Amino acid sequence: MQVILLEKVVNLGNLGEIVRVRDGYARNFLIPQKKARRATDAALKEFEARRAELEKIQAEKLAAAEALGGRLAGYQLKIVQKAGVDGRLFGSVTNADVAEGLKKAGFEAVEKAQVRLPNGPLKAVGEYPIQVALHADVTVDVTVVVEGDIA
């Protein structure tokens, strides 16, 4: 299926590009999330009429993400979790826990899907570098300090 991208999509293309994707990807992800439309003649005409508006919205989103990234860059998040005497956690710290901690710290715009844990969930006490992808072009490094609450 050919679609017109309504915003930048990682590993696919930029705003306004017409790309060919699998039908399921278009129907189940891109179109419901308003990231793309089917590439019909009517949709192309409507897109060209709204192109300036969509580019302005994209620029505003990018500026907001860069502003948040400037505040978030180098931030150190402390998470306390129950742990055994050897430093292993009972359970783990997931991207949802990190996103919740960042929201409590005043970064409300961070969603769990934006948090990237390079080695999977954190299962031991220590400091871990993680990345937060605020926008397709804005990725920020954050340090998560996991402290153990001896059970």
Curated annotation (Swiss-Prot):
Coiled-coil ranges (or none): none
GO CC annotations, alphabetized: ribonucleoprotein complex; ribosome
Transmembrane segments: none
GO aspect biological process, one term: translation
InterPro entries associated with the record: Ribosomal_bL9, Ribosomal_bL9/RNase_H1_N, Ribosomal_bL9_bac/chp, Ribosomal_bL9_C, Ribosomal_bL9_C_sf, Ribosomal_bL9_N, Ribosomal_bL9_N_sf
Keywords: Ribonucleoprotein, Ribosomal protein, RNA-binding, rRNA-binding
MF (Gene Ontology): rRNA binding; structural constituent of ribosome
Entries under NCBIfam families matching the protein: L9
Function comment: Binds to the 23S rRNA.
Assigned protein family: Belongs to the bacterial ribosomal protein bL9 family.
Protein name as catalogued: Large ribosomal subunit protein bL9
Species whose genome carries this gene: Bordetella petrii (strain ATCC BAA-461 / DSM 12804 / CCUG 43448)
